[in-house]
Structure formats: structure tokens, C-alpha cells
Design a protein with these regions (language model features):
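Residue-level detector of conserved, well-ordered beta-strand and adjacent loop positions
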Residues: 53, 80, 111-113, 185
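Conserved tyrosine-mediated DNA breakage-rejoining catalytic core shared by Y-recombinases
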Residues: 28, 37-95
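Basic, Lys/Arg- and aromatic-enriched nucleic-acid-binding interface segment
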Residues: 9-38, 46, 72-74, 82, ...
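DNA/chromatin major-groove-contacting recognition/catalytic segments
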Residues: 9, 61-65, 161, 182, ...
């Protein structure tokens, strides 16, 4: 989990090309494979939600779509105003792809320079490079950051704000409430440590 200050610093320092990608990951808590699989048809601006019912993956044989292993993975994730604006910017600058269709899905939002969908490995590498560049010029370094850490950070922030655990479980698509409750325990410990440090400073 990254701190609030680090959460703000990361998108700001990102290359302009990846600013909205990182912001959306921080503001939605999506799994990176869910994020990469987003298509234009998954955006519901009228109801401010994201339709999550598939993941985009890639192996040695190529791209493929995988549906959630449990029904908990199928959900409508709330879209904040900030995330909504980021998606609008993504759509505005989106280049027309090669008309690629993967297992019946088309119009993917996040494409590389060749017009092919981005993958989890690409974002993992990109975040590593962004952190490395940031740390080169700042005295207070960022920790290791991965797409999963951004998801964990999103979830922890909502737990710290005492969101109803069942609601948070739904948003995150956790198969078990225990996964969600463990994050509440982590959030409580983190909050206690921060408060203790502020009191004895």
C-alpha cells in the first residue's frame, strides 16, 4: 500500500501518456487484467459505473479473454467523477485500432503504439520505470509499485474510511468476505501506526 502523498505523487510524475491509466487504476481498484480488458462498451457514463465481466490475458499463444472464476467477479464498479474525466480523456485521444477482435470483444480502450491491447506485464514494467525515474530526482523515494499494489491501495483507503465491508467486497470482486476483512485489519494497523507516530513526534 502506498501513502496518500505517494498516491498523489505517482500520477503527477507519470509520463503524460500513462497519467490517466495510473489514475484510473488508483480510483477504481480494478485487477490489471480487468483494466486491460475494458472496452468502450463497458463504460456507463449515465449511471457512473464500469461493467466488469471479463479479463484480458496473454500467453505465448496470444491474447485471450477469461471470464471471472466466481460470480463475485461480475460486477458494476462505481465510477468517480475524477475517474470519469480520465476515461473521457482516454476516449478523446484513442486511436482507431486495427479492428482487433479477441474472443468476441472489440474496441479495447488501452492500446499500445501498434494498436494492440496493453497487457499486465507492460504496466508492471512501466510502473517500475516510472518509480525508478522518480526516485532518481527525489529525496523521499517511492516504494516498489505494481498494478496489484494500486488495487490494494484503493481498497485500503476505502477500508480506512469505514466503508461497509460487504459493499467493499462487491466493488473489489472478492470471492470471500475474509479477503476484504483482512484489508480492514491492515488498514487499522496502518492507521494506528500513523497516529502513534504523530502523537510521539
Amino acid at each position: 500500500c502506498v501513502t496518500g502523498v505517494q498516491t498523489c505523487a505517482l500520477p503527477i510524475y507519470c509520463y503524460q501518456r500513462y497519467y490517466d491509466d495510473v489514475l484510473i487504476l488508483l480510483k477504481t481498484g480494478l485487477r490489471i487484467s480487468e483494466f486491460c480488458g475494458l472496452t468502450k462498451h463497458d463504460l456507463d457514463f449515465e449511471n457512473h459505473t464500469l461493467n466488469i465481466d471479463h479479463q484480458l490475458l496473454r500467453n505465448q499463444e496470444g491474447y485471450y479473454i477469461e471470464t471471472p472464476k466466481t460470480k463475485c467477479g461480475i460486477r458494476k464498479v462505481p465510477m468517480s467523477e475524477e475517474a470519469g474525466k480520465a476515461f473521457q480523456r482516454v476516449l478523446k485521444r484513442k486511436k482507431t485500432g486495427k479492428g482487433i477482435v479477441i474472443d468476441g470483444y472489440r474496441n479495447f480502450l488501452f492500446l499500445n503504439q501498434k494498436g494492440m491491447p496493453m497487457t499486465a506485464c507492460y504496466y508492471t514494467s512501466t510502473l517500475r520505470n516510472i518509480v525508478k525515474k522518480y526516485n532518481k530526482y527525489h529525496d523521499e523515494p517511492l516504494p516498489k509499485i505494481t498494478p496489484h499494489i494500486l488495487r490494494h491501495t484503493f481498497c485500503t483507503r476505502l477500508a480506512q474510511k469505514n466503508m461497509n465491508p460487504k459493499n467493499l467486497q462487491y466493488i473489489m470482486g472478492h470471492s470471500s468476505i475474509m479477503i476484504t476483512l483482512n484489508l480492514y485489519a491492515h488498514a487499522s494497523q496502518t492507521g494506528a501506526n500513523m497516529e502513534m507516530r504523530s502523537l510521539i513526534a
